[in-house]
Amino acid sequence: ALRLRKKGYEFQDARRDHWPAADLSLTSAFPKLPDRAAAPERLRDALKRDAERVAAGRLRFFGHLDVQTDTPPNWQRDYLAGVDVPTGKSAFKLNHRELPDGAAIKPLWEPSRWAGPVRLAQACWLLGNRRSGEHCLDWLEDWVANNPPYTGWHWTSALESGMRLIAFTWIDA
């Protein structure tokens, strides 16, 4: 029954020649950020702590490994193996299974998933910490400068690019 209902909506939408405009007023149901005053104190404390940790280059890899990095990170470094793996090659000619000197691709990708900049952006918005926002932008600008499109390890996976897009939407919110 649910599948038929979904197909019915798809059929109706396919024939629609006029889509309603998005209602961005304060009374609309369109998603928007919550009121800052409603944020619990525990969240504020956690954001303050995380922003200080990230600004000092202490990142959490895979949700549980605390790793000291440069700030901004060296985007071409596997911090777990302590190995730099710079390359100027096209991402389409790289094989992430053939990294040199014991390096692995996942620790190399982890800082580029932008969990740190997301927390910095959240701290900027919720706590009014302008320095966290500037720090977030510094990291993003450094990433862009050091990872040209389709060049290097960070462009070998469409999934990783998608994760960066999701993180960017959080930062941009």
Protein language model features and the residues they cover:
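Intrinsic structural disorder
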Residues: A1-K7, N129, L137
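Extended, charge-enriched "interface" segments that sit outside catalytic cores
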Residues: L2-L99, K106-P111
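Aromatic-lined, polymer-binding surfaces characteristic
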Residues: V85-K89, R97-E98, G102-A173
